[in-house]
């Protein structure tokens, strides 16, 4: 960790970056650190406890609009960065990405393609526990599945913590804030909560990198990640595309191919 701190201090002192986004110790686990001065860089940590996806801050202009930014990235953050780059949300010359390998050595990536190459050795995989939960849900009848999710949605208070924590929810104006017309009702009720989550999952189709930030952020413990990760598996099975990699062919939901399957049309 000392090598990472030394690297960050050097970057700040030499003026290579204006801000370093990383992790520090908090009162209840780790929390984001926004480091602009070298004298607080010794608060940086990067270990297995750093599970929240701090790549969410890379699309915040109030943080990144003042100059070059560095980020100390975990694997989920690296996948997010590649996905955001694919969606033209990041500028390569405005971002410096750091990581730490298994030997504690600091990796400074030269660009998004290098991150993409690095991630090839760490393919995106759903945990065995989540796979079992998804399989259990898929074995249910449609009516049983609907009853299960309506039960979960009845807990939702529409705080939008899932949206705030997701690094790929970066719309300047979310559909739930549009009131002309009112696509989704603003109050919390099982059916309108379900409308919101179905909309969110569809927007994540082919994009979710499986970081679990939505589940972690939910104060009611709703397993929202099972929706997006199940969709992620379906996209991989049907289109052969995994998110968190530079897909030159285009986004699966905005790209048409003449040979696309049409057997779902009745």
Give the positions of each predicted feature.
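Helix N-cap / loop-to-helix initiation motif
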Residues: 77, 162, 223-224
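Extended mid-to-C-terminal alpha-helical interaction segments
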Residues: 154-174
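Iron-sulfur-associated redox domains of electron-transfer enzymes in respiratory
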Residues: 1-155, 167
């Amino acid at each position: 960790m000392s090598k990472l701190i030394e690297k960050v201090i050097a970057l700040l002192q030499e003026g290579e970056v204006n801000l370093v986004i990383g992790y520090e110790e908090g009162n209840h686990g780790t929390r984001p650190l926004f480091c602009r001065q070298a004298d607080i860089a010794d608060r940086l940590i990067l270990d297995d406890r750093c599970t929240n996806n701090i790549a969410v801050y890379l699309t915040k202009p109030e943080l990144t609009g003042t100059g070059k930014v560095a980020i100390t990235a975990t694997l989920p953050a690296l996948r997010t960065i590649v996905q955001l780059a694919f969606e033209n949300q990041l500028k390569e010359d405005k971002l410096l990405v750091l990581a730490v390998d298994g030997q504690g050595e600091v990796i400074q990536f030269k660009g998004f393609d290098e991150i993409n190459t690095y991630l090839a050795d760490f393919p995106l995989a759903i945990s065995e526990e989540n796979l079992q939960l998804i399989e259990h849900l898929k074995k249910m009848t449609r009516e049983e599945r609907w009853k299960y999710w309506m039960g979960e949605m009845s807990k939702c208070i529409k705080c939008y913590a899932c949206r705030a924590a997701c690094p790929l929810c970066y719309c300047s104006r979310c559909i739930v804030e549009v009131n002309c017309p009112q696509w989704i009702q603003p109050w919390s009720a099982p059916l309108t909560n379900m409308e919101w989550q179905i909309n969110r999952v569809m927007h994540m189709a082919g994009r979710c990198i499986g970081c679990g930030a939505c589940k972690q952020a939910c104060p009611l413990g709703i397993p929202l990640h099972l929706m997006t990760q199940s969709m992620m598996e379906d996209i991989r099975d049907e289109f052969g595309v995994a998110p968190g990699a530079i897909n030159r062919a285009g986004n699966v939901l905005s790209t048409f191919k003449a040979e696309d399957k049409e057997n779902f049309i009745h």
